[in-house]
Amino acid sequence: MMRPRLPGALSLALAAALLSAAAVLAGPPPTETRPATDDLHGVKLMDPYRWLEGSDAPEIAAPDPALDARVAAWTDAQNAYSRRILDGLTGRDLLAERLAELEEVGTIEAPTVRGGGAGGDLYFYRERRGEQAQAVLYVRRGLEGESRVLVDPVEVDASGLTTIAWYEPSRDGKLLAFGLYRGGDELATLYLLRVADGEWLAEEISGKVRGVFWLPDGSAFFYRRLAEVENPYSAQIRFHRVGRHHRHDPVVFEQYKEGPLATTWGPVALTDHEARWLALMYHTGTDSNDLWVYDVERFVTTGELEEIEIVRGENATFTPLVIGDALYLHTTLDAPNGRVVAVDPARPAREHWREILPERDKAVLEGVSHARGRLAAHYLVDAATRIELFDLEGRPLGAVDLPGLGSARLTTEPERDEAFLTFQSFHQPASIYRVDLGSGERTLWARPEVPVDPTLFTVRQVFYASKDGTQVPMFLVYRKDLELDGGNPTILSGYGGFSVSQTPRFSSRNVPWLEAGGVIAVANLRGGGEYGEAWHRSGMLERKQNVFDDFIAAAEWLVASRYTDVAHLGVAGGSNGGLLTGAALVQRPDLFSAVFCAVPLLDMLRYQYFLMARFWVPEYGSAEDPEHL
């Protein structure tokens, strides 16, 4: 049996240091205050730290270098203070060594399969081997064929700062479209290469490109890009013919510029395997979207778009899956846990819809894919995955066998019985299995060799009562020999927003903490998608306080159940989870001894003025609207 790599006493000393390090030094550098007053619907509000917005503040018409320099100096001083604390932590070097060992473990993704002609199918996949700085895109002919490098980011850029953002082979596997992030940015540039010899073609399309959908003959594709890379509201869907300069690419759809739909997220377009229909969606938040379809062949031959409206103005989501001439819609309309209906674009009125997979009370339908006349339905049951197969009329064909309780994704192809299952849990890294959907046989295809003994740990799911009595699930991960003595160092995390579900996932960064005797707790808060759209909506807009109450109740349960105490309890969250931990700290500073608040939204009166945040107004509301206060 593998032993913990960090000595227990040293590790617990490190945990104690992490939870009390703020007391080592005097407080952080003082922050200058400058008067700023807002009149918010008749209420006067003071904001003495407004100046820290710098030139990004909407009131500032032109860049102010002097102001930005003061903001940078403040940031540098705060970072220097943090570094003095973090660099002085007991056992930090040993922890860094163990983390480096774990990070050296490679990663691999499930392959994308394309027909390769007489020579056999082509399997495209990304893999980062232990010594590689970035994942490399490989192709092999046949499942057991020899792998060949197609794109190595380090060969493109020796600095190691270039990564593969996405890739999409043509249907026949002859051409490959892929995106590269360069210099650490997230503005993917599209390139094309010929798979047979790896030669890059002339195409180079910039503008945060993603969402490539090929025509079946590989002659052209649709793609999404930003017309202005600094403007997240400038999205376009364009059409590109291979070999033609992209300046000639027609704009098929674009972001709404004004009016009530200007805050919708879109356009989002996709096509099916046969490119029969082009589906167009505009989203309002994460809980509703409109949907149209267009005849692809007509557009390609005439340049004309004949619009067929499928649904518009409903407070529900509609995700299309095109199979032949039919649309299979995964929707929350009249089904907050999700269902599937079949729609004939020739008769799109709702009275002609056919229900294929009805809503379930105890399971949330997360998505559905097509595999040679089968529907593969991904369900979430108490925040863990279940995958079931159905024929195209909704008749059950059985469940896909999973290795255990965890998170799973089945990658399917419309014309194949072969699929690939990616499975992971809190203490087991992502493994990939080949699944024969005809026989149900599952065989291991790839598993990273991680220097961790998963048998040391246990995963437990508990349910606790929130402030209003709502039962909330929480996962706990810890060593099997843990004693409930009320003093175990514990990290509690959560998210609670945008219908994002917190399912069991492996993180190498948690391993040293667990090996040392620490506890990882993940709360499945309202606002997430663990129990469908009703669960999401109970944690958004005017009900956002439910999320904070759920999180605080989780911390109280951990203390009351003697997993930990206040002196050994830390909380962590990022983005919307950063808002969560920030609110928890403000509302219950007595309950935690450490808070990791990463890239948070904390100024909820003004967040909507920055970057792409106006897309989040349907989730959070806006202080500009008195009804949202």
Protein language model features and the residues they cover:
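Peripheral, non-catalytic segments that deliver or gate enzyme domains
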Residues: K44-L45, R50-W51, S55-T90, L94-V149, ...
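Active-site-proximal cap/loop segments of hydrolase catalytic domains
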Residues: V522-L629
